[in-house]
Protein backbone atom coordinates (compact mmCIF):
# COMPACT_ATOMS: atom_id res chain seq x y z
CA UNK A 1 0.00 0.00 0.00
CA UNK A 2 1.42 3.39 -1.03
CA UNK A 3 2.03 5.99 1.68
CA UNK A 4 -0.44 8.71 0.71
CA UNK A 5 1.18 11.23 3.08
CA UNK A 6 4.77 10.67 1.93
CA UNK A 7 4.75 13.54 -0.58
CA UNK A 8 3.04 16.69 0.64
CA UNK A 9 2.70 20.43 0.25
CA UNK A 10 2.35 22.92 3.11
CA UNK A 11 0.08 25.93 2.47
CA UNK A 12 0.48 28.92 4.79
CA UNK A 13 -2.70 30.95 5.19
CA UNK A 14 -2.54 34.76 5.35
CA UNK A 15 -6.33 35.17 5.41
CA UNK A 16 -7.41 35.02 1.76
CA UNK A 17 -10.93 33.84 0.95
CA UNK A 18 -9.34 31.62 -1.72
CA UNK A 19 -6.89 29.73 0.53
CA UNK A 20 -9.00 26.59 0.94
CA UNK A 21 -9.40 26.56 -2.83
CA UNK A 22 -5.61 26.26 -3.21
CA UNK A 23 -5.65 23.20 -0.96
CA UNK A 24 -8.53 21.65 -2.89
CA UNK A 25 -6.72 22.18 -6.20
CA UNK A 26 -3.53 20.55 -4.89
CA UNK A 27 -5.56 17.59 -3.61
CA UNK A 28 -7.33 17.32 -7.01
CA UNK A 29 -3.90 17.03 -8.61
CA UNK A 30 -3.37 13.98 -6.39
CA UNK A 31 -0.99 15.43 -3.80
CA UNK A 32 -1.66 15.61 -0.07
CA UNK A 33 -1.45 19.07 1.48
CA UNK A 34 -2.28 20.81 4.72
CA UNK A 35 -3.30 24.38 5.41
CA UNK A 36 -1.74 26.12 8.42
CA UNK A 37 -1.80 29.65 9.82
CA UNK A 38 1.13 31.81 8.65
CA UNK A 39 2.76 32.13 12.10
CA UNK A 40 3.88 28.49 12.46
CA UNK A 41 7.21 27.64 14.07
CA UNK A 42 10.32 26.26 12.40
CA UNK A 43 9.91 23.08 14.45
CA UNK A 44 6.37 22.55 13.14
CA UNK A 45 7.48 22.94 9.53
CA UNK A 46 10.41 20.56 10.07
CA UNK A 47 8.07 18.06 11.70
CA UNK A 48 5.70 18.17 8.74
CA UNK A 49 8.63 17.89 6.28
CA UNK A 50 6.87 19.27 3.19
CA UNK A 51 8.16 18.76 -0.36
CA UNK A 52 7.13 22.33 -1.14
CA UNK A 53 5.50 25.37 0.47
CA UNK A 54 2.81 27.69 -0.88
CA UNK A 55 2.37 31.17 0.62
CA UNK A 56 -1.29 32.04 0.05
CA UNK A 57 -2.96 35.41 -0.41
CA UNK A 58 -4.37 37.68 2.27
CA UNK A 59 -6.23 40.94 2.87
CA UNK A 60 -3.39 42.79 4.66
CA UNK A 61 -0.85 45.15 3.09
CA UNK A 62 2.82 44.14 3.20
CA UNK A 63 3.63 47.85 3.52
CA UNK A 64 1.72 48.13 6.83
CA UNK A 65 3.45 47.80 10.19
CA UNK A 66 3.08 44.40 11.84
CA UNK A 67 1.48 42.81 8.76
CA UNK A 68 1.99 39.01 8.58
CA UNK A 69 5.28 37.55 7.32
CA UNK A 70 6.27 34.04 6.37
CA UNK A 71 8.52 32.30 8.91
CA UNK A 72 12.16 32.89 7.86
CA UNK A 73 12.70 29.13 7.83
CA UNK A 74 10.42 28.85 4.77
CA UNK A 75 13.21 30.32 2.64
CA UNK A 76 15.92 28.18 4.27
CA UNK A 77 14.12 24.83 4.24
CA UNK A 78 15.63 23.77 0.91
CA UNK A 79 12.25 23.14 -0.73
CA UNK A 80 10.44 24.99 -3.55
CA UNK A 81 8.25 27.93 -2.53
CA UNK A 82 5.33 29.47 -4.45
CA UNK A 83 3.98 32.85 -3.33
CA UNK A 84 0.47 33.76 -4.49
CA UNK A 85 -0.70 37.41 -4.42
CA UNK A 86 0.11 38.55 -0.83
CA UNK A 87 2.41 35.51 -0.66
CA UNK A 88 4.46 36.86 -3.58
CA UNK A 89 4.60 40.30 -1.97
CA UNK A 90 5.82 39.08 1.42
CA UNK A 91 8.34 36.78 -0.31
CA UNK A 92 9.63 39.75 -2.27
CA UNK A 93 9.84 42.01 0.79
CA UNK A 94 11.48 39.35 2.99
CA UNK A 95 14.11 38.47 0.37
CA UNK A 96 15.20 42.07 -0.28
CA UNK A 97 12.74 43.34 -2.88
CA UNK A 98 10.37 46.28 -2.52
CA UNK A 99 6.57 46.42 -2.42
CA UNK A 100 4.66 49.68 -2.79
CA UNK A 101 1.17 50.55 -1.67
CA UNK A 102 -1.33 50.66 -4.51
CA UNK A 103 -3.06 54.01 -4.82
CA UNK A 104 -5.82 53.62 -7.39
CA UNK A 105 -3.67 51.27 -9.47
CA UNK A 106 -4.82 47.87 -8.24
CA UNK A 107 -6.04 45.09 -10.48
CA UNK A 108 -9.30 43.36 -9.64
CA UNK A 109 -10.83 40.74 -11.90
CA UNK A 110 -9.75 39.56 -15.34
CA UNK A 111 -6.27 40.44 -16.61
CA UNK A 112 -3.92 39.15 -19.28
CA UNK A 113 -0.27 38.50 -18.48
CA UNK A 114 2.49 38.29 -21.07
CA UNK A 115 5.27 35.77 -20.42
CA UNK A 116 8.65 37.50 -20.78
CA UNK A 117 11.04 34.75 -19.63
CA UNK A 118 10.80 30.94 -19.69
CA UNK A 119 9.97 29.31 -16.35
CA UNK A 120 9.22 25.79 -15.13
CA UNK A 121 5.99 27.14 -13.65
CA UNK A 122 4.61 28.19 -17.05
CA UNK A 123 6.17 25.44 -19.17
CA UNK A 124 4.09 24.71 -22.32
CA UNK A 125 1.20 26.88 -21.09
CA UNK A 126 -0.48 29.59 -23.15
CA UNK A 127 -3.97 30.93 -23.89
CA UNK A 128 -2.92 33.10 -26.83
CA UNK A 129 0.17 34.61 -28.50
CA UNK A 130 0.99 38.33 -28.42
CA UNK A 131 1.93 40.37 -31.50
CA UNK A 132 5.56 40.02 -30.43
CA UNK A 133 5.19 36.22 -30.36
CA UNK A 134 5.10 35.79 -26.57
CA UNK A 135 2.63 33.58 -24.68
CA UNK A 136 -0.39 35.30 -23.14
CA UNK A 137 -2.35 33.91 -20.20
CA UNK A 138 -5.82 34.85 -18.93
CA UNK A 139 -5.65 35.26 -15.15
CA UNK A 140 -7.66 36.56 -12.19
CA UNK A 141 -6.17 39.42 -10.20
CA UNK A 142 -7.17 40.80 -6.81
CA UNK A 143 -4.50 43.16 -5.48
CA UNK A 144 -3.93 46.79 -4.60
CA UNK A 145 -0.22 46.76 -3.65
CA UNK A 146 2.41 45.61 -6.13
CA UNK A 147 6.06 44.58 -6.26
CA UNK A 148 8.23 47.51 -7.41
CA UNK A 149 11.65 45.81 -7.20
CA UNK A 150 12.12 42.04 -7.26
CA UNK A 151 14.74 40.44 -4.97
CA UNK A 152 18.28 39.67 -6.12
CA UNK A 153 18.52 36.37 -7.99
CA UNK A 154 14.97 36.64 -9.35
CA UNK A 155 13.84 37.45 -12.89
CA UNK A 156 10.54 38.94 -14.00
CA UNK A 157 8.69 36.12 -15.74
CA UNK A 158 5.46 37.95 -16.68
CA UNK A 159 3.84 41.36 -16.60
CA UNK A 160 0.58 43.16 -17.40
CA UNK A 161 0.06 46.69 -18.67
CA UNK A 162 -0.18 48.03 -15.11
CA UNK A 163 1.77 45.40 -13.12
CA UNK A 164 5.48 45.24 -14.08
CA UNK A 165 6.10 42.05 -12.05
CA UNK A 166 3.01 39.84 -12.43
CA UNK A 167 5.21 36.76 -11.94
CA UNK A 168 8.81 36.29 -10.79
CA UNK A 169 11.12 33.33 -10.39
CA UNK A 170 14.44 32.25 -8.93
CA UNK A 171 14.84 28.97 -10.81
CA UNK A 172 18.04 28.01 -8.90
CA UNK A 173 16.29 28.10 -5.54
CA UNK A 174 12.92 27.09 -7.05
CA UNK A 175 11.23 30.17 -5.59
CA UNK A 176 8.25 31.50 -7.57
CA UNK A 177 5.83 34.37 -7.10
CA UNK A 178 2.59 35.12 -8.98
CA UNK A 179 0.52 38.25 -8.39
CA UNK A 180 -2.66 36.54 -9.68
CA UNK A 181 -4.70 33.62 -8.32
CA UNK A 182 -3.99 30.31 -10.13
CA UNK A 183 -6.42 28.47 -7.83
CA UNK A 184 -9.60 30.14 -9.18
CA UNK A 185 -11.30 28.85 -12.33
CA UNK A 186 -11.12 32.31 -13.95
CA UNK A 187 -7.36 31.71 -14.34
CA UNK A 188 -7.89 29.27 -17.19
CA UNK A 189 -4.55 27.45 -16.96
CA UNK A 190 -4.22 27.84 -13.18
CA UNK A 191 -4.53 24.15 -12.40
CA UNK A 192 -1.73 23.33 -14.86
CA UNK A 193 0.53 25.87 -13.12
CA UNK A 194 -0.18 24.21 -9.77
CA UNK A 195 0.47 20.80 -11.37
CA UNK A 196 3.85 22.05 -12.60
CA UNK A 197 4.66 23.27 -9.09
CA UNK A 198 3.51 20.18 -7.16
CA UNK A 199 4.45 17.38 -9.58
CA UNK A 200 7.41 18.73 -11.58
CA UNK A 201 9.10 21.35 -9.39
CA UNK A 202 8.40 19.73 -5.97
CA UNK A 203 8.64 16.22 -7.50
CA UNK A 204 5.60 14.93 -5.58
CA UNK A 205 3.91 11.70 -6.64
CA UNK A 206 0.17 11.87 -7.34
CA UNK A 207 -0.97 9.13 -4.96
CA UNK A 208 -3.73 10.99 -3.10
CA UNK A 209 -6.65 9.11 -4.73
CA UNK A 210 -10.00 7.80 -3.39
CA UNK A 211 -8.98 4.11 -3.41
CA UNK A 212 -5.69 4.88 -1.63
CA UNK A 213 -7.41 7.18 0.88
CA UNK A 214 -9.93 4.43 1.74
CA UNK A 215 -7.19 1.81 2.18
CA UNK A 216 -5.23 4.17 4.41
CA UNK A 217 -8.31 5.16 6.47
CA UNK A 218 -9.40 1.53 7.01
CA UNK A 219 -5.88 0.54 8.09
CA UNK A 220 -5.65 3.44 10.53
CA UNK A 221 -9.11 2.75 11.95
CA UNK A 222 -8.21 -0.89 12.61
CA UNK A 223 -5.05 0.20 14.44
CA UNK A 224 -6.81 2.92 16.45
CA UNK A 225 -9.88 0.89 17.47
CA UNK A 226 -8.52 -2.65 17.73
CA UNK A 227 -11.25 -4.95 19.09
CA UNK A 228 -13.23 -2.15 20.74
CA UNK A 229 -16.77 -1.10 19.83
CA UNK A 230 -17.73 2.26 18.29
CA UNK A 231 -20.92 4.35 18.41
CA UNK A 232 -21.86 6.81 15.63
CA UNK A 233 -24.68 9.32 15.28
CA UNK A 234 -25.94 8.57 11.75
CA UNK A 235 -28.01 11.39 10.24
CA UNK A 236 -28.18 10.13 6.67
CA UNK A 237 -26.15 13.15 5.54
CA UNK A 238 -23.00 12.81 3.44
CA UNK A 239 -20.39 12.99 6.22
CA UNK A 240 -21.92 10.60 8.75
CA UNK A 241 -22.89 8.17 5.96
CA UNK A 242 -19.33 7.96 4.64
CA UNK A 243 -17.98 7.57 8.21
CA UNK A 244 -20.45 4.70 8.72
CA UNK A 245 -19.31 2.95 5.54
CA UNK A 246 -15.60 3.35 6.36
CA UNK A 247 -16.07 2.03 9.89
CA UNK A 248 -18.25 -0.84 8.68
CA UNK A 249 -15.47 -1.84 6.28
CA UNK A 250 -12.86 -1.57 9.04
CA UNK A 251 -14.61 -3.12 12.06
CA UNK A 252 -17.89 -4.64 10.80
CA UNK A 253 -20.46 -5.40 13.52
CA UNK A 254 -18.43 -3.63 16.21
CA UNK A 255 -20.05 -0.40 14.94
CA UNK A 256 -23.43 0.71 16.33
CA UNK A 257 -25.15 3.57 14.50
CA UNK A 258 -27.77 5.66 16.30
CA UNK A 259 -30.28 7.25 13.93
CA UNK A 260 -32.45 9.88 15.63
CA UNK A 261 -35.64 10.77 13.75
CA UNK A 262 -36.36 14.24 15.08
CA UNK A 263 -39.51 14.79 13.01
CA UNK A 264 -37.67 17.52 11.09
CA UNK A 265 -36.45 15.38 8.18
CA UNK A 266 -37.48 15.38 4.52
CA UNK A 267 -40.35 13.23 3.21
CA UNK A 268 -39.71 9.49 3.80
CA UNK A 269 -36.11 10.23 4.79
CA UNK A 270 -36.14 8.09 7.94
CA UNK A 271 -37.38 5.05 5.99
CA UNK A 272 -34.77 5.63 3.28
CA UNK A 273 -31.93 5.77 5.82
CA UNK A 274 -33.07 2.57 7.53
CA UNK A 275 -33.60 0.74 4.22
CA UNK A 276 -30.22 1.74 2.82
CA UNK A 277 -27.96 1.28 5.83
CA UNK A 278 -29.87 -1.38 7.71
CA UNK A 279 -31.38 -3.61 5.02
CA UNK A 280 -29.06 -2.99 2.06
CA UNK A 281 -25.64 -2.49 3.65
CA UNK A 282 -26.33 -4.54 6.79
CA UNK A 283 -25.18 -2.01 9.39
CA UNK A 284 -26.23 -2.29 13.00
CA UNK A 285 -28.64 0.66 13.49
CA UNK A 286 -30.66 1.80 16.49
CA UNK A 287 -33.67 3.82 15.23
CA UNK A 288 -34.93 6.37 17.77
CA UNK A 289 -38.27 7.98 16.89
CA UNK A 290 -38.12 11.24 18.85
CA UNK A 291 -40.45 13.51 16.88
CA UNK A 292 -42.70 14.35 19.85
CA UNK A 293 -39.74 15.02 22.12
CA UNK A 294 -38.22 17.58 19.73
CA UNK A 295 -41.54 19.27 18.96
CA UNK A 296 -42.43 19.49 22.67
CA UNK A 297 -39.04 21.05 23.44
CA UNK A 298 -39.56 23.73 20.77
CA UNK A 299 -43.16 24.52 21.71
CA UNK A 300 -43.74 28.27 21.79
CA UNK A 301 -40.19 29.11 20.60
CA UNK A 302 -39.95 31.36 17.53
CA UNK A 303 -36.35 32.61 17.71
CA UNK A 304 -34.14 30.86 15.08
CA UNK A 305 -31.00 30.74 17.22
CA UNK A 306 -32.91 29.41 20.22
CA UNK A 307 -34.51 26.73 18.02
CA UNK A 308 -31.10 25.61 16.78
CA UNK A 309 -29.81 25.33 20.34
CA UNK A 310 -32.87 23.40 21.53
CA UNK A 311 -32.58 20.93 18.64
CA UNK A 312 -28.87 20.44 19.35
CA UNK A 313 -29.46 20.04 23.09
CA UNK A 314 -32.24 17.44 22.69
CA UNK A 315 -30.13 15.49 20.20
CA UNK A 316 -27.25 15.41 22.70
CA UNK A 317 -29.58 14.19 25.46
CA UNK A 318 -30.92 11.36 23.30
CA UNK A 319 -27.51 10.38 22.01
CA UNK A 320 -26.16 10.31 25.57
CA UNK A 321 -29.02 8.03 26.65
CA UNK A 322 -28.46 5.66 23.72
CA UNK A 323 -24.69 5.58 24.20
CA UNK A 324 -25.14 4.45 27.80
CA UNK A 325 -27.07 1.44 26.48
CA UNK A 326 -24.02 0.49 24.36
CA UNK A 327 -22.04 -0.55 27.41
CA UNK A 328 -19.08 -1.91 25.44
CA UNK A 329 -18.58 1.17 23.25
CA UNK A 330 -15.18 2.76 23.84
CA UNK A 331 -15.17 5.17 20.89
CA UNK A 332 -17.40 7.90 19.48
CA UNK A 333 -17.19 8.45 15.70
CA UNK A 334 -17.86 11.87 14.19
CA UNK A 335 -18.05 13.24 10.65
CA UNK A 336 -15.63 16.13 11.23
CA UNK A 337 -14.15 17.22 7.88
CA UNK A 338 -11.06 19.31 7.07
CA UNK A 339 -12.81 22.72 6.79
CA UNK A 340 -14.12 22.17 10.37
CA UNK A 341 -10.54 21.55 11.53
CA UNK A 342 -9.27 24.65 9.70
CA UNK A 343 -12.11 26.77 11.12
CA UNK A 344 -11.34 25.64 14.68
CA UNK A 345 -7.61 26.21 14.29
CA UNK A 346 -8.10 29.62 12.70
CA UNK A 347 -10.49 30.90 15.33
CA UNK A 348 -7.60 31.77 17.68
CA UNK A 349 -7.09 35.02 15.72
CA UNK A 350 -10.48 36.22 16.90
CA UNK A 351 -11.28 37.63 13.46
CA UNK A 352 -14.15 35.26 12.63
CA UNK A 353 -17.73 36.25 13.39
CA UNK A 354 -20.47 33.72 14.14
CA UNK A 355 -23.26 34.20 11.60
CA UNK A 356 -25.23 31.14 12.72
CA UNK A 357 -24.41 28.57 15.38
CA UNK A 358 -23.38 25.23 13.89
CA UNK A 359 -25.35 22.11 14.71
CA UNK A 360 -22.75 19.49 15.54
CA UNK A 361 -22.19 16.57 17.86
CA UNK A 362 -19.36 18.60 19.38
CA UNK A 363 -21.48 19.42 22.44
CA UNK A 364 -21.65 15.86 23.74
CA UNK A 365 -21.19 15.50 27.53
CA UNK A 366 -17.64 15.26 28.88
CA UNK A 367 -18.58 12.34 31.13
CA UNK A 368 -19.18 10.07 28.14
CA UNK A 369 -15.53 9.03 28.48
CA UNK A 370 -15.32 7.84 24.89
CA UNK A 371 -12.31 8.21 22.63
CA UNK A 372 -12.88 10.22 19.44
CA UNK A 373 -12.72 8.69 15.95
CA UNK A 374 -12.71 11.18 13.06
CA UNK A 375 -11.81 9.35 9.83
CA UNK A 376 -12.71 12.31 7.57
CA UNK A 377 -10.80 15.05 9.39
CA UNK A 378 -8.21 15.32 6.58
CA UNK A 379 -10.79 15.54 3.78
CA UNK A 380 -12.65 18.30 1.96
CA UNK A 381 -16.35 17.78 1.15
CA UNK A 382 -15.72 16.98 -2.52
CA UNK A 383 -13.21 14.31 -1.44
CA UNK A 384 -15.72 12.83 1.02
CA UNK A 385 -18.24 12.48 -1.82
CA UNK A 386 -15.72 10.75 -4.10
CA UNK A 387 -14.86 8.31 -1.33
CA UNK A 388 -18.57 7.68 -0.74
CA UNK A 389 -19.01 6.71 -4.39
CA UNK A 390 -16.03 4.36 -4.14
CA UNK A 391 -17.62 2.77 -1.04
CA UNK A 392 -20.86 2.10 -2.93
CA UNK A 393 -23.11 4.90 -1.70
CA UNK A 394 -25.58 6.14 -4.36
CA UNK A 395 -24.75 9.26 -6.37
CA UNK A 396 -28.16 10.84 -5.69
CA UNK A 397 -27.58 10.66 -1.94
CA UNK A 398 -24.00 11.96 -2.03
CA UNK A 399 -24.76 14.85 -4.37
CA UNK A 400 -28.03 15.93 -2.80
CA UNK A 401 -28.33 19.62 -2.04
CA UNK A 402 -27.18 20.72 1.44
CA UNK A 403 -29.70 20.20 4.23
CA UNK A 404 -29.28 22.09 7.53
CA UNK A 405 -28.46 20.15 10.69
CA UNK A 406 -31.64 21.39 12.45
CA UNK A 407 -33.59 20.31 9.34
CA UNK A 408 -37.09 21.70 8.91
CA UNK A 409 -36.66 23.37 12.31
CA UNK A 410 -35.12 26.34 10.49
CA UNK A 411 -37.26 26.05 7.35
CA UNK A 412 -40.48 26.53 9.28
CA UNK A 413 -40.37 30.22 10.18
CA UNK A 414 -41.21 30.98 13.78
CA UNK A 415 -42.71 28.30 16.04
CA UNK A 416 -42.36 24.73 14.75
CA UNK A 417 -45.51 22.59 14.76
CA UNK A 418 -46.17 19.10 13.40
CA UNK A 419 -48.86 20.45 11.03
CA UNK A 420 -46.37 22.92 9.54
CA UNK A 421 -43.65 20.28 9.13
CA UNK A 422 -46.03 17.84 7.43
CA UNK A 423 -47.20 20.47 4.93
CA UNK A 424 -43.65 21.64 4.28
CA UNK A 425 -42.40 18.08 3.68
CA UNK A 426 -45.03 17.51 0.98
CA UNK A 427 -44.44 20.87 -0.73
CA UNK A 428 -40.67 20.44 -0.71
CA UNK A 429 -40.95 16.92 -2.15
CA UNK A 430 -43.01 18.24 -5.09
CA UNK A 431 -40.49 21.03 -5.77
CA UNK A 432 -37.52 18.63 -5.72
CA UNK A 433 -39.36 16.02 -7.82
CA UNK A 434 -40.17 18.61 -10.49
CA UNK A 435 -36.57 19.89 -10.51
CA UNK A 436 -35.38 16.33 -11.22
CA UNK A 437 -38.01 15.83 -13.94
CA UNK A 438 -37.00 19.07 -15.67
CA UNK A 439 -33.28 18.15 -15.30
CA UNK A 440 -32.74 21.34 -13.32
CA UNK A 441 -31.80 19.81 -9.96
CA UNK A 442 -28.05 19.59 -10.61
CA UNK A 443 -28.04 22.93 -12.45
CA UNK A 444 -28.85 24.77 -9.22
CA UNK A 445 -26.65 24.59 -6.13
CA UNK A 446 -29.43 24.36 -3.57
CA UNK A 447 -33.22 24.29 -3.71
CA UNK A 448 -35.78 23.96 -0.96
CA UNK A 449 -39.14 25.17 0.33
CA UNK A 450 -39.82 27.41 3.33
CA UNK A 451 -43.03 27.42 5.38
CA UNK A 452 -44.35 30.89 6.19
CA UNK A 453 -46.66 31.08 9.23
CA UNK A 454 -49.10 33.45 7.49
CA UNK A 455 -52.47 32.64 5.98
CA UNK A 456 -53.62 33.86 2.57
CA UNK A 457 -57.00 33.81 0.86
CA UNK A 458 -57.39 31.39 -2.03
CA UNK A 459 -60.20 30.15 -4.28
CA UNK A 460 -60.92 26.45 -4.83
CA UNK A 461 -63.91 25.74 -7.06
CA UNK A 462 -66.80 27.88 -5.84
CA UNK A 463 -65.38 28.26 -2.36
CA UNK A 464 -62.81 30.41 -0.66
CA UNK A 465 -60.08 29.01 1.52
CA UNK A 466 -57.77 30.68 3.98
CA UNK A 467 -54.58 28.62 4.11
CA UNK A 468 -50.82 28.75 4.53
CA UNK A 469 -48.09 30.19 2.29
CA UNK A 470 -44.82 28.54 1.22
CA UNK A 471 -41.83 30.06 -0.53
CA UNK A 472 -39.65 28.25 -3.05
CA UNK A 473 -35.91 29.01 -2.87
CA UNK A 474 -33.27 28.05 -5.45
CA UNK A 475 -29.76 29.51 -5.68
CA UNK A 476 -26.65 29.22 -7.82
CA UNK A 477 -23.27 29.51 -6.14
CA UNK A 478 -19.69 28.25 -6.32
CA UNK A 479 -18.71 28.45 -2.66
CA UNK A 480 -21.94 29.27 -0.75
CA UNK A 481 -20.22 32.45 0.50
CA UNK A 482 -22.13 34.45 -2.13
CA UNK A 483 -25.10 33.26 -4.20
CA UNK A 484 -27.48 34.39 -6.95
CA UNK A 485 -31.14 33.40 -7.01
CA UNK A 486 -31.73 30.87 -9.78
CA UNK A 487 -33.64 32.13 -12.82
CA UNK A 488 -35.91 29.10 -13.13
CA UNK A 489 -38.32 29.11 -16.12
CA UNK A 490 -41.72 30.68 -15.43
CA UNK A 491 -43.61 27.68 -16.82
CA UNK A 492 -41.65 25.42 -14.46
CA UNK A 493 -42.44 27.60 -11.44
CA UNK A 494 -46.08 27.70 -12.51
CA UNK A 495 -46.21 23.90 -12.69
CA UNK A 496 -44.69 23.53 -9.22
CA UNK A 497 -47.07 26.12 -7.76
CA UNK A 498 -50.14 24.45 -9.30
CA UNK A 499 -49.15 21.03 -8.01
CA UNK A 500 -48.47 22.27 -4.47
CA UNK A 501 -51.76 24.20 -4.20
CA UNK A 502 -53.89 21.50 -5.85
CA UNK A 503 -52.32 18.45 -4.22
CA UNK A 504 -51.75 19.70 -0.67
CA UNK A 505 -54.75 20.54 1.45
CA UNK A 506 -53.65 23.44 3.64
CA UNK A 507 -51.53 25.56 1.28
CA UNK A 508 -53.18 28.35 -0.72
CA UNK A 509 -50.25 30.36 -2.07
CA UNK A 510 -46.71 29.76 -3.40
CA UNK A 511 -44.11 32.53 -3.78
CA UNK A 512 -40.56 32.47 -5.20
CA UNK A 513 -37.63 34.04 -3.31
CA UNK A 514 -35.52 36.30 -5.55
CA UNK A 515 -33.01 37.49 -2.92
CA UNK A 516 -29.27 37.13 -3.48
CA UNK A 517 -26.59 36.50 -0.86
CA UNK A 518 -25.67 39.09 0.28
CA UNK A 519 -27.81 40.80 1.49
CA UNK A 520 -29.97 37.75 2.31
CA UNK A 521 -28.61 34.43 3.58
CA UNK A 522 -29.41 31.26 1.62
CA UNK A 523 -31.54 29.76 4.40
CA UNK A 524 -34.30 31.97 5.78
CA UNK A 525 -33.29 31.27 9.38
Swiss-Prot record:
Quote any Pfam family the record assigns: GMP_synt_C
Q: Name one GO cellular component term.
A: cytosol
Q: Which residues cross the membrane?
A: none
What reaction is this protein's catalytic activity? XMP + L-glutamine + ATP + H2O = GMP + L-glutamate + AMP + diphosphate + 2 H(+)
Domain GMPS ATP-PPase: residue ranges: 208-400
Q: What class of enzyme is it?
A: ligase
Indicate the residues that form the catalytic site: 85, 181, 183
Keyword check for 4Fe-4S: no
Q: Which residues bind ATP?
A: 235-241
Which HAMAP family does the UniProt record give?
A: GMP_synthase
**What is the official name of this protein in its record?**
GMP synthase [glutamine-hydrolyzing]
UniProt source species: Shewanella sediminis (strain HAW-EB3)
Phylogenetic classification of the source organism: Bacteria, Pseudomonadati, Pseudomonadota, Gammaproteobacteria, Alteromonadales
Amino acid sequence: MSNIHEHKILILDFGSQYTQLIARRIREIGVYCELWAWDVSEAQIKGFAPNGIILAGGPESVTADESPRAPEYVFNAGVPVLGICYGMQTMSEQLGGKVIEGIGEGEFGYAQIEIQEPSELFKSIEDAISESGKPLLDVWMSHGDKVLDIPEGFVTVANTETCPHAAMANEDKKFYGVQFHPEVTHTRQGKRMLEHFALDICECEANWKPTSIIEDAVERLKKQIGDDEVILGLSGGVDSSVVAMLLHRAIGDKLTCVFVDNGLLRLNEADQVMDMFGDHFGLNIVHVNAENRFLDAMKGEADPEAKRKIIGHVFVEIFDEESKKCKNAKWLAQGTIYPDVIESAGSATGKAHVIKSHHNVGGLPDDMELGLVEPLRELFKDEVRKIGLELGLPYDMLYRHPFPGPGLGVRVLGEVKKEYCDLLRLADAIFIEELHKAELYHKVSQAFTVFLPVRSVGVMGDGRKYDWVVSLRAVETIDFMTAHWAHLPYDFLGRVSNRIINEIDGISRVVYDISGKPPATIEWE
